[in-house]
Structures are given as structure tokens and as C-alpha cells.
Curated annotation (Swiss-Prot):
SMART domains: Ribosomal_L32e. GO terms for cellular component: cytosol; ribonucleoprotein complex; ribosome. It comes from Mus musculus. The keyword Zinc does not apply. GO terms for molecular function: structural constituent of ribosome. The keyword Ribonucleoprotein applies. The lineage of its organism: Eukaryota, Metazoa, Chordata, Craniata, Vertebrata. This is Putative large ribosomal subunit protein eL32'. One of its GO terms (biological process) is translation. Keywords: Ribonucleoprotein, Ribosomal protein. The gene is Rpl32-ps.
Length: 135
């Protein structure tokens, strides 16, 4: 099967790839890394002092045209059963199927086979497929 290319492949610009970490999470073990907005009256991060960690704001948002776009130029479409890849039949140059995490390995095989018949690419075709010798 020839490699499908996306209709348009815009340049994806990530304004920031590092995670935003919580203030003083590097200092204390009990404070997790997950971002929380600082709300203290004297907090240096909230007041945006020079040299402090950065806070997320609207300026870091992705471009609307390239948001949720894979590096290959396609977008993901979550598939839960064998009938859902047929939705992508007319737009297989802009979308790729991704099998949901809660689909059984038996149904995964069927979805991958059906997608191959319809010339639809799957982003995770080999996930949770067991070899024949293990069965």
C-alpha cells in the first residue's frame, strides 16, 4: 500500500514544550509537580518576578489550524468498534484512526484488518496484539 500523505502539512509551532511545574515542587517532596496557580498575597511567581518559574497563559496556546495535529500532518480519530473506521472513508487524507485503550485485543485485530481494507491508516496497530505462539 502506498504511503498516504496529508492534503496539507502546515508547520507545527510549539511555543513551549516543557511542562509548567508547581511553585516549590522541586523543594518539597509532598508538593507534586502538577501545575497549580499560586494564590498567595506575596507569591513571587504570581507577581511575575524575574527569574521565577513561568505561569501558563493564553500566549502559549497552539495555533488553531495546527492544534491536535500529529507530526505527520494527520489528525487522530478515536475508534471504539469495527464500524467506526468507515466514517473516515472520505477523509483518509486528513485523519488517522487511533484505537481506544479499552478495546479488546480480539476487536483490535478486526479493526486493523477493516482499516486496511478501507485504506485507512491506524496510529497504534500493534498495541496489545499477542503473538500466536503465546496463545
Amino acid at each position: 500500500m502506498a504511503a498516504l500523505r496529508p492534503l496539507v502539512k502546515p508547520k507545527i509551532v510549539k511555543k513551549r514544550t516543557k511542562k509548567f511545574i508547581r511553585h516549590q515542587s522541586d523543594r518539597y517532596v509532598k508538593i507534586k509537580w502538577n501545575w497549580r496557580k499560586p494564590r498567595g498575597i506575596d507569591n513571587r511567581v504570581r507577581r511575575r518576578f524575574k527569574g521565577q518559574i513561568l505561569m501558563p497563559n493564553i500566549g502559549y496556546r497552539s495555533n488553531k489550524k495546527t492544534k491536535h495535529t500529529l507530526s505527520s500532518g494527520f489528525r487522530k480519530f478515536l475508534v471504539h468498534n469495527i464500524k467506526e473506521p468507515e466514517v473516515l472513508l472520505m477523509c483518509n487524507k486528513s485523519y488517522r484512526a487511533e484505537i481506544a485503550h479499552n478495546v479488546s485485543s480480539k476487536n483490535r485485530k478486526a479493526i486493523v484488518e477493516r482499516a486496511a481494507q478501507l485504506a485507512i491508516r491506524v496510529t497504534n496497530p500493534n498495541t496489545r496484539l499477542h503473538s500466536e505462539e503465546n496463545e
